[in-house]
Amino acid sequence: MAVRMRLKRMGAKKQPSYRIVVADVRAPRDGRFIEELGHYNPTTEPVTLEINEEKAKKWLQEGAKPSQKVRSLLTQAGVVEK
């Protein structure tokens, strides 16, 4: 089973917030996921970013591939180096 770390859209219309989740690559964007790693809200000032580093590192070691945006968020949080 191939898994990917990606964003799951939450929030109201025109006010998105996102959960950072680990999901099967075949699952829909807002569908079933395996585990939640944190959340990201780009609409607040300053931007809110919270990631459970232990869970993220565990999934990266198990072979989960982060999406492009999640990779940049993990770098920003200091979980992954550039």
Curated annotation (Swiss-Prot):
Kindly give the Pfam families that the UniProt entry links to this protein.
Answer: Ribosomal_S16
Family named by the database record = Belongs to the bacterial ribosomal protein bS16 family.
Look up the signal peptide feature and give its range. Answer: none
Q: Tell me a GO cellular component.
A: cytoplasm
Key words, A-Z: Ribonucleoprotein, Ribosomal protein
User: Which GO terms fall under molecular function for this chain's record?
Assistant: structural constituent of ribosome
- What's a BP term from Gene Ontology annotated to this protein? translation
- What name appears for this protein in its UniProt entry? Small ribosomal subunit protein bS16
NCBIfam families for the chain: S16
Which InterPro entries does the record match to this protein?
Answer: Ribosomal_bS16, Ribosomal_bS16_CS, Ribosomal_bS16_dom_sf
